[in-house]
C-alpha cells in the first residue's frame, strides 16, 4: 500500500459539527438517541484492514444508540464534557481526559445527562476470535 499517512484537518471537522441549536431541536422531538459521528479512518484505509477511528459528539440530554461487537476491542478517549459509559450494565462516570476500554462482547452505550456536549475520540481494532 502506498499510503504513509493521512491528515484530517480540524477545521473540516468543526465545520461539520454544528451547534447546540441542533440538540435543542432534537430534544423537542422526544427521541434521545442523538449524536454526531465523524469517521476519521475506515478499515479499508489501514494496511491491516482492522482499524476504525472516529470522533463522536453526544449532545446534552442525549445518548448513543449503543452496540456490541464480539470481534473488536474499543478504546474511548474523552476530549470535552462529562457523561456516563454503560458496559454490560455497569455505569461509569467519564470526563475530559479519561480513557475507557471496552472488551469484545458486552453491549455498551454513552449517555450525556449534562448541559454541555460530550466529545470523545474512539478506536476499534478487529481481533482474531
Q: What is each residue range found by the language model?
A:
Residues 1-50, 65:
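A short, N-terminal "cap"/entry segment at the start of jelly-roll beta-barrel domains
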Residues 55-56, 101, 116-129:
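A short hydrophobic beta-strand segment most commonly corresponding to one strand
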Residues 89-104:
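Short acidic-glycine-tyrosine-enriched beta hairpin
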